[in-house]
């Protein structure tokens, strides 16, 4: 340094200090000859500091000395050996050693092993240590799952704690057409995974266990499932192997199981279009309780021409015994596509929940509820909610050939149907509730309810249901002596039907309330062979004037009750053409806007309620006043003068009165002067008919 600055404190601004600092920094940063430079103190002896170049050299030496030098020094008993550096290794009898640190090199070994051995460290695993430290070092470690019995303290225990994975059993796969795992037949590996999970539960006392598949494509024939085993797909696609036999199920859970689950994201792919048209299969086949199928794509299941088998997910009883029914099962968040038969079939089940799924482009129903056989299947409690259906033939079919109450307590709501023939199709069911926000675009029936006499249908409610298109909005049909017991239709919006918005046959306990209809062709509401039906607050609008009744009571219908009707665009409001005379109850006022004939009834029918109108007397002693409400034995008619001439007439000997015996049922009543002489013909009256 040019100046002695040892007396100046740190931070001094003295020019000499600044000069020395500049010189030191120049050496520290730019020298390629000096590894060290001396600082200026101060107020202590100067210390050596690393130059930048010196730090580089020191680092390079460290890297160089970190590896072992090969070939090793050979130790020969009885011969001295000098070890110059710590990186040198010594070989004796095939084993490697290094000098134990710390040590002062060079180290002189005597050649007497008993004296030299304490100075050395056994190093035969050093190369393995370095290989294990590499990025792929984990591939050198073997592992076989064991049962945990203590807290996790080792890598072995940590590995034992993770879900069982199918790749643990890849060694069992023998059918490998190519190195690509997507071409292998993984059935043995999946079966071993499931069986191992079952064994683990039996030995550990666990109630359920988790397995893991994905990601990747795995070709399989059929996996026989076990109770308690839950599998997370993790992006896996389980795909039917090209050699799969006819009639199998990709996942076969039919051994009277309990507590099983299949969770996405993942795919169950039957790959049906690559098989012979006669090839049949199921996706997930369950004879089980406590089942969950969630967040999966289930696609390409079934056969092209054979309609037995072919379901995406099916719940069944034991066949033929019928001694086991599915229970507490859920399918949610799944997407079904290109399913040849039913996307989901319930042939047996208590508390079955089908929630928030998508159903697309499949041959038959999104959900088919159909008891297996005559006495084997039992269905009690099915919820179908929040689903989206597009391109299936049916939305929900619930069909049984069993006796009363074989299928009951079915609730459907909040579903959307597009491009379907029928949204709902019920046969032989009881306690069914449909609607609750449903929207349906159909080509035939919004809801079809059927009874043929072999089974009965009871307690059907359709509420808050919007349907458009098709032939019928709601069609309750009976044949061969069939009948319905209690059907309630409320808060419906029906548009664009070609035959009838609502037709109901052979029902006791029919209620139609708060229904809004807009049509431009076909008939109106048709009630046939029903006992005491009630229609309230029905709004019927013909988009063009339709020459049909808005509401028709026909056949053996008895005691119909109507009220609050709002009808426009029809030539006839309410038509009663029953085969026998009956009493019609008018429950409240009705509005017939532009309807030429508000009421059309067969003579003899008695319409309870109140009818009113006006007329002008003829210049005669008597005249007939038309009114469909007239009943010759029961009607009470009041005449109300509405001008001075009528008041004068009523105050004198010519007072007009109604002669029931000369009137005609449902056609007209006879008005006659009291003295039998002619009225002036200028008298105007209002009338009120009371049918009590």
From Swiss-Prot:
<dbReference type="GO" id="GO:0044423">
    <property type="term" value="C:virion component"/>
</dbReference>
<feature type="repeat" description="PbH1 3">
    <location>
        <begin position="379"/>
        <end position="400"/>
    </location>
</feature>
<feature type="repeat" description="PbH1 2">
    <location>
        <begin position="349"/>
        <end position="371"/>
    </location>
</feature>
<feature type="repeat" description="PbH1 7">
    <location>
        <begin position="557"/>
        <end position="578"/>
    </location>
</feature>
<keyword id="KW-0677">Repeat</keyword>
<dbReference type="InterPro" id="IPR012334">
    <property type="entry name" value="Pectin_lyas_fold"/>
</dbReference>
<feature type="repeat" description="PbH1 4">
    <location>
        <begin position="406"/>
        <end position="428"/>
    </location>
</feature>
<comment type="function">
    <text>Structural protein.</text>
</comment>
<dbReference type="GO" id="GO:0051701">
    <property type="term" value="P:biological process involved in interaction with host"/>
</dbReference>
<dbReference type="InterPro" id="IPR006626">
    <property type="entry name" value="PbH1"/>
</dbReference>
<feature type="repeat" description="PbH1 6">
    <location>
        <begin position="507"/>
        <end position="529"/>
    </location>
</feature>
<feature type="repeat" description="PbH1 5">
    <location>
        <begin position="457"/>
        <end position="478"/>
    </location>
</feature>
<feature type="repeat" description="PbH1 1">
    <location>
        <begin position="326"/>
        <end position="348"/>
    </location>
</feature>
<dbReference type="InterPro" id="IPR011050">
    <property type="entry name" value="Pectin_lyase_fold/virulence"/>
</dbReference>
<dbReference type="GO" id="GO:0019058">
    <property type="term" value="P:viral life cycle"/>
</dbReference>
<keyword id="KW-0946">Virion</keyword>
<protein>
    <recommendedName>
        <fullName>Structural protein 2</fullName>
    </recommendedName>
</protein>
């Amino acid at each position: 340094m040019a100046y002695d600055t040892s007396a100046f404190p740190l931070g001094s601004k003295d020019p000499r200090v600044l000069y020395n600092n500049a010189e030191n920094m120049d050496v520290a940063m730019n020298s390629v000859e000096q590894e060290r430079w001396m600082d200026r103190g101060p107020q202590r002896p100067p210390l050596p500091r690393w130059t930048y170049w010196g730090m580089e050299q020191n680092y390079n030496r460290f890297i160089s000395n970190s590896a072992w030098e090969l070939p090793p020094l050979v130790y020969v008993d009885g011969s001295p050996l000098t070890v110059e550096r710590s990186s040198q290794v010594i070989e004796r009898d095939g084993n490697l050693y290094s000098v134990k640190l710390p040590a002062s090199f060079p180290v002189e070994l005597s050649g007497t092993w008993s004296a030299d051995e304490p100075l050395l460290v056994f190093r035969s695993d050093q190369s393995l240590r370095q290989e294990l430290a590499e990025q792929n070092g984990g591939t050198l470690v073997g592992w076989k799952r064991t049962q945990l019995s203590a807290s996790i303290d080792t890598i072995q225990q940590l590995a034992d704690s993770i879900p069982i994975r199918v790749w643990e059993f890849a060694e069992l796969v023998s059918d490998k057409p190519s190195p690509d795992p997507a071409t292998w037949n993984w059935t043995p590996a999946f079966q071993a995974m499931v069986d191992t999970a079952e064994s683990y539960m039996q030995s550990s006392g666990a109630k359920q266990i988790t397995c893991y598949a994905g990601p990747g494509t795995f070709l399989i024939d059929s996996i026989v499932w076990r109770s308690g085993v839950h599998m997370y797909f993790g992006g896996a696609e389980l795909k039917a192997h090209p050699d799969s036999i006819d009639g199998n199920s990709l996942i076969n859970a039919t051994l009277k199981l309990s507590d099983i689950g299949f969770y996405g994201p993942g795919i169950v792919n039957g790959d049906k279009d690559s098989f012979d048209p006669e090839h049949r299969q199921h996706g997930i086949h369950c004879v089980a309780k406590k089942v969950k199928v969630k967040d999966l794509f289930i696609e390409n299941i079934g056969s092209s021409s054979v309609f037995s088998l072919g379901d995406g997910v099916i719940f069944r009883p034991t066949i033929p015994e019928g001694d086991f029914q599915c229970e507490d099962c859920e399918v949610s968040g799944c997407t079904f596509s290109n399913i040849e038969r039913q996307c989901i079939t319930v042939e047996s089940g208590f508390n079955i929940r089908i929630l928030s799924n998508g159903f697309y482009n499949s041959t038959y129903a999104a959900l088919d509820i159909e008891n297996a056989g005559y006495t084997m299947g039992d269905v009690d409690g099915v919820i179908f909610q929040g689903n989206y259906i597009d391109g299936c033939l049916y939305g929900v079919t619930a069909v049984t050939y069993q006796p009363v109450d074989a299928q009951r307590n079915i609730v459907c709501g909040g579903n959307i149907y597009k491009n379907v023939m029928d949204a709902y199709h019920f046969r032989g069911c009881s306690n069914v509730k449909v609607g609750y926000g449903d929207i349906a675009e159909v080509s035939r029936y919004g809801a079809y309810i059927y009874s043929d006499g072999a089974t009965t249908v009871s307690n059907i409610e359709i509420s808050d249901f919007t349907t458009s298109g098709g032939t019928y909005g709601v069609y309750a049909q009976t044949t061969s002596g069939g009948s319905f017991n209690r059907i309630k239709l409320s808060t419906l919006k029906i548009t664009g039907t070609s035959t009838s918005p609502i037709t109901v046959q052979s029902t006791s306990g029919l209620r139609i309330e708060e229904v809004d209809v807009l049509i431009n062709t076909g008939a109106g509401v048709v009630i046939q062979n029903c006992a005491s039906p009630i229609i309230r607050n029905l709004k019927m609008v013909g988009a063009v004037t339709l020459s049909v009744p808005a509401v028709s009571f026909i056949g053996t219908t008895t005691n119909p009750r109507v009220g609050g009707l709002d009808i426009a665009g029809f030539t006839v409001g309410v038509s009663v053409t029953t085969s026998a005379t009956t009493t019609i109850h008018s429950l409240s006022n009705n509005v017939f806007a532009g309807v030429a004939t508000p009421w059309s009834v067969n003579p003899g029918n008695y319409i309870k309620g109140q009818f009113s109108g006006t007329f002008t007397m003829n210049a005669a002693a008597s005249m007939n006043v038309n009114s469909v409400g007239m009943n010759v034995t029961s009607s009470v008619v009041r005449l109300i003068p509405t001008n001075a001439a009528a008041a004068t007439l009523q105050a004198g000997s010519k007072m007009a009165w109604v002669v029931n015996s000369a009137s005609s049922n449902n056609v007209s009543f006879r008005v006659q002067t009291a003295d039998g002489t002619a009225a002036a013909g200028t008298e105007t009256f209002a009338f009120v008919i009371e049918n009590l």
